[in-house]
Amino acid sequence: MIYSRSRLPSEGEILIATVKQVFDYGSYVTLDEYGGLQAFLPWSEVSSKWVKNIRDVLKENRKVVVKVIRVDRRKGTVDVSLKKVTDDERRKKNLQWKKIQRLDKILELVSQQLKLSEKDAWEQVAWKLEAKYGDPISAIERAVKEGEKILIDAGVPEIWIKPLLEEAAKHTEEKKVKMSGLITVKTSEPLGVQKIKEVISKALENIEQDYESILNVKIYTIGAPRYRVDVVGTNPKDASEALNQIISNLIKIGKEENVDISVVKK
C-alpha cells in the first residue's frame, strides 16, 4: 500500500485516480497515492469538448490521471479535473506512477522480511530518500550500483539497508522493447492538421494506464501522409497488444472524424 506524508493532496497536484462510480453529473474516484481517498470529478471537468455520454469517457475501475482543483481541509473533501491535465503532464505522471508501483513492491517485500509494517517502510525509507534526493526509487537504484552510502546519507536506519539493497537488485529496470507500425493519415477536412492531432490524442487515451508495462508511446510523421507509431515497454506481449490497440483506435476514431487512416506495416 502506498502511503503519503499528508492526509490530503494540494491544489494543482497531478495524481493517479481509479474511477469507482459514474453518474450523469460526474464521477467518484479514489486517489491511489492517498490511501484510496475519495474525490469528486464533476461533469464539467471531464472533457474540454462536448461529450454526449459521460460513460464514453469514464469507465469504472479504470485508472486516470487527474489534477486537484479544490481541497476543503475542514471537511476533508477533494475535487479533481480530467480536462485540466495536459498530455505532457499525463505522460510524466504515468512514468512516475510506474516508479511508485515498483518502489511500493520493494518496500512491501522488505517490510515482510523484517516483520515490520509497510507504513514503517514508507516513513523510514521512502520519505527519507524523497526528502534527500527527490525520487526514492532512483535513489535506491543508485544505491544498488554505488553502495549503501546513498541510503545512510539520507538517514535510512541500518536495519533496512542490507535487505533493501538485496531486494532492489532483483527489481532493477527491465530491458526495454520497442514495437513500431507505419500508417498513412489523410483528410480533406478544413484545419486538417488540427483534426489529425485530435484523432491521435483520442487514440492514445488510457493506453499507458491499461498496459502497466508500457513506458512510452509516440506517433509522429516521417513525411506526410506517412506516420510511425512507436510503443516502448518492458513486456513484448503488452507492447504488441498496445500497438494493435492504438492502430485500431486510430482507424475507428478516424472514421468518426472523417480522417482516412490505413496500415502500411505492423
Curated annotation (Swiss-Prot):
The lineage of its organism: Archaea, Thermoproteota, Thermoprotei, Sulfolobales, Sulfolobaceae. PANTHER family: EUKARYOTIC TRANSLATION INITIATION FACTOR 2 SUBUNIT 1 (PTHR10602:SF0). SMART domains: S1 (SM00316). InterPro entries: NA-bd_OB-fold, S1_domain, S1_IF2_alpha, TIF2_asu_arc, TIF2_asu_C, TIF2_asu_middle_sf, TIF_2_asu. Keywords: Initiation factor, Protein biosynthesis, RNA-binding. HAMAP family: eIF_2_alpha. GO terms for molecular function: ribosome binding; RNA binding; translation initiation factor activity. eIF-2 functions in the early steps of protein synthesis by forming a ternary complex with GTP and initiator tRNA. It comes from the Archaea. This is Translation initiation factor 2 subunit alpha. Belongs to the eIF-2-alpha family. Heterotrimer composed of an alpha, a beta and a gamma chain. Transmembrane segments: none annotated.
